[in-house]
Amino acid sequence: MRTLAGVEDEDKWLAEGIAGIQHNAFFMHRALDANNLREVLKYSALMLSELRTSKLSPQKYYDLYMRAFDQLRQLEIFFKDESRHGLPVVDLYELVQHAGNILPRMYLLCTVGSVYIKSKQAPSKDVLKDLVEMCRGVQHPIRGLFLRSYLAQVSRDKLPEIGSDYEGDANTVMDAVEFVLQNFTEMNKLWVRIQHQGPGTVREKQEKERNELRDLVGKNLHVLGQIEGVDLEMYKETVLPRVLEQVVNCKDKLAQYYLMECIIQVFPDEYHLQTLETLLAACTQLMPTVDTKIVLTQLMDRLSNYAASSPDVLHEFLQVEAFAKLSNAIGKVIDTQLEMPIVGAMTLFVSLLTFTLRVHPDRLDYVDQVLGACVVKLSSVPKLEDARAMKQVVALLSAPLEKYSDIVTALTLSNYPRVMDHLDDGTNKVMAMLIIQSIMKTDSCISTADKVEVLFELIKGLIKDLDETNAEELDEEDFQEEQNSVARLIHMLDNEEPEEMLKIICVVRRHLMTGGPRRLPFTVPPLVFSAVRLVRQLESQGGDIAGEDSATPRKIFQILNQTIEVLTSVPCPELALRLYLQCAEAASDCDLEPVAYEFFTQAFMLYEEEIADSKAQVTAIHLIVGTLQRINVFGVENRDTLTHKATGYSARLLKKPDQCRAVYACSHLFWVDDPDGIKDGERVLLCLRRALRIANAAQQMASATRGSSGPVTLFVEILNKYIYFFEKGNPHITPSDIQSLIELINNEMQSDNGNTTIHSDPFFTSTLRYIKFIKQKGGLMGEKYDPIKL
């Protein structure tokens, strides 16, 4: 506020003022001890004259005032005791009015006036009216403000309100209100005028110091809020209009903001609701620089809490049309305050929506109306780039998700997706993730194609690239999390009616196909499994599974074939092969042999043309064999074709051990442990013997390249297959076959440098232990094992 020299001067002036107060207070106390009224008045007036200074800032003046205030309390005690000064309080009240300077005179008058009221020798209202009028004589902003603050303080417990010791006639409450209102009005005028004190160069610091004095003015409103007998009618007709008149007319940013805050905080919620129109009208008349959004937000928060306090008050909100009034007021504020940044408007919409969801959660039209107003405002700006505004829009969109446990409710809001369209790509994804998380958290089921359409429009930022953003630029971990969330969401889409479920699948498929090669491997599998689940549902319900109805397994399999085919162009052949096999198994369960055969054909074509990696080939072969084993829909010709292909691929794998394992796995294709399953023991034996030859070749290659035959694991694995089929009753597997294989393994182990013991291979040891256990156990199976010598 001041230069360094000015600050030093001010400190010096404050020190001089305090010294003056202390000096005169010393003589005043001597006079008090001597009960010398004339000297008391003389030195108290001199002491209070120090408050006449105009050299101090508000903060420094406050320090000086508090020193004088402490002395005035001692003076009041003296004035109360008539035996000490010998004058009736009426005469004393007249006497102090002869003090030379007006400021000391008024402080003394207020002090004696307090004693005068307490003596009840005059009505409280008359004394207070006299004092509040005479205080007009001090018009210096700082001196006048502190004088009236002193008057408010000494009169607080002496107001003529209902139930007090100073209660008067029928209009007693009005008298108390009138005094406080008059003092408030004058104090606010003085407070506002402080900003014009001193040069313009010190305005910023002056405003800060003026802000520190705001409670001196605000205390009057707190007193008004606590006066007994101020009912709704008096508040509506007198108190609020007078206070708001002063707020609006003062044309001061700081005063308007602070006083509106005070009004909202100190008066009852019920009063705010019943005077909502008046209060909101004042908000629209505030200075453009006033942060009206905070004022309105605080008002809506209070009203929301009031509504939540009891269901009985909700009808009051409907009676006064609270939502319509708040909505109109917010619209006016946004339209008139042209300088309000977009974040301010969004904050107001968030507050209004929060109010609506708490007070009228059943009125979706209100919720959609707020979102619609937000769309209009967002459409008026070229592009939403303010991060704070974006955060508020996310809060706006999140509020319905948090309020309604069923996400379907939010999907019915027509303006919801229109708000999301104004988000940037990154924020759109954040919001889409929040929507999916809300569905997962509440375990919501989206059960109609229309709602799925709306939902996938909302989360399109996760499904496809927006604004030409390249998916390759995204963080891999974040990208995977997003796509896994979409995959989980697909499993939450369900309907018991097959036709509607098929519509849902088609809607999802249409959206997912726009996702590009990087997303499809995440999103296609859950779609396929969802469709397969529908197929199994139809199969369990019976009916014409290949008929002309809109939802039949045959038609669903056509969609599945087209969907999986897209994966082959990604390319993602291993995943496509797995899905083809899943569909083949489902087609088998529906007894659709041609469809199942077609899916196997597609799987074999992928294997031949797309899968070149040796490890991937091994995995694919075992998947093919495992699936083919479980399928029993094929006739002899088709099954022979497929099993021949599978065994042929197995024998052509790159590594001998892989060949061996794949070939002996094919043995299960000819012996299915099921009453109706195929049981071709001869071909089982052929597979096992072929596997044995491959294992032997692998041993010879190991011996040639490494100088030792290596482990006998392959032989032991084949031995276990022999034992399996032997126990299953394959007549072509005999004890002598098992015996020969055991001896072969023993020989292989002993020939490896001649120092390997029988027990060096745990797998082989465990297998022999099993055979021994079965032999000892006896019974039919034990008898079968008897010819085998260990």
From Swiss-Prot:
Q: Name it.
A: Vacuolar protein sorting-associated protein 35B
**Topology versus the membrane:** Peripheral membrane protein
A Pfam family that this protein carries is Vps35
Where in or outside the cell it occurs: the entry states: Cytoplasm; Endosome membrane; Prevacuolar compartment membrane; Golgi apparatus, trans-Golgi network membrane
Q: In Gene Ontology terms, what is a biological process of this protein? A: retrograde transport, endosome to Golgi
Q: In which tissues is it expressed?
A: Expressed in siliques and maturing seeds (at protein level).
One GO CC annotation, please?
retromer, cargo-selective complex
InterPro entries named among the record's database cross-references? ARM-type_fold (IPR016024), Vps35 (IPR005378), Vps35_C (IPR042491)
Keyword annotations for this protein, in alphabetical order, are: Cytoplasm, Endosome, Golgi apparatus, Membrane, Protein transport, Transport
The annotated subunit structure for this chain is: Component of the retromer complex which consists of VPS29 (MAG1), VPS26 (VPS26A or VPS26B), VPS35 (VPS35A or VPS35B or VPS35C), VPS5/17 (SNX1 or SNX2A or SNX2B). Component of a retromer subcomplex consisting of VPS29 (MAG1), VPS26 (VPS26A or VPS26B), VPS35 (VPS35A or VPS35B or VPS35C).
User: Which residues belong to the signal peptide in this entry?
Assistant: none
Q: Which family does it belong to?
A: Belongs to the VPS35 family.
Question: In which domain of life is the source organism classified?
Answer: Eukaryota
- Function per UniProt: Plays a role in vesicular protein sorting. Component of the membrane-associated retromer complex which is essential in endosome-to-Golgi retrograde transport. Also involved in the efficient sorting of seed storage proteins globulin 12S and albumin 2S. The VPS29-VPS26-VPS35 subcomplex may be involved in recycling of specific cargos from endosome to the plasma membrane.
Give the organism, scientific name: Arabidopsis thaliana
